[in-house]
Amino acid sequence: QKVMRRTFVIAIFIVLFILSTALMDSASSQDKPIVLKLGHAVAPEHPYHLGAVKYSELVAQRTKNKVKIDVYPSTQLGNERDMVEGLQLGTIDLVVTSTGPLGGFVPKMFIVDLPFLFRDREHAYKVLDGPIGRDLLDAFAAKGIKGLAFWENGFRQITNNVRPIEKPEDLKGIKIRTMENKVHLASFRAFGASPTPMAWSEVYTALQQKTIDAQENPIAIIYFQKIYEVQKYLALTG
């Protein structure tokens, strides 16, 4: 079975509402382009960023340059939780984030972080692109946020500096970084690991200084964030 983490694109609902009005005004008054901020947590080489840049290009093209989206990678606008809060405050317009922090805003989102929830990639797409996924996205409206779509982040793999991980018991005693997510914490405790919540921006240094032993992420993040420089073992747990 597979563990799949799917990413989540969200934007403030009120910004989308104002945007339609502003575009009509802009068309008649020739005002400057509307500039929106889009933030995410990973490196500029990651598919998140490449997709966000392409998205900004398409928006500019289809609005005839009336709307411009500036993309901020690598937690420039804060960690993922900070950026979601920024949506509510109106300081950020769009965010691409993992599902990890979202249960703190909409509790039903914790369901997608359960281990072994999906049989395979096709199953995940069918669920999240269907009525269940739409219901999860719509739940954010009550928080002043508009859920737009799910993006794929990949399968979760574990890296560590202690020993090869070949079976669940091998996780016993390993201090592994997780997000501040009660499902993640409970899952790793059940395997005997010692989960340690930590902001993503602190993980590389924490691994380097041996404050933690391990972390888990899809291969793209492990590669583009250069986690291999500070980790010895990779377990394809996804």
Model-inferred region functions:
Residues Q1-V35:
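Short, low-complexity disordered leader/linker segments with a strong preference
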Residues S20, D135-L136:
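A short hydrophobic/aromatic micro-motif that marks alpha-helical segments and, especially, helix-coil
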Residues S28-H123, P131-I132, D138-G238:
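N-terminal secretory/targeting leader peptides
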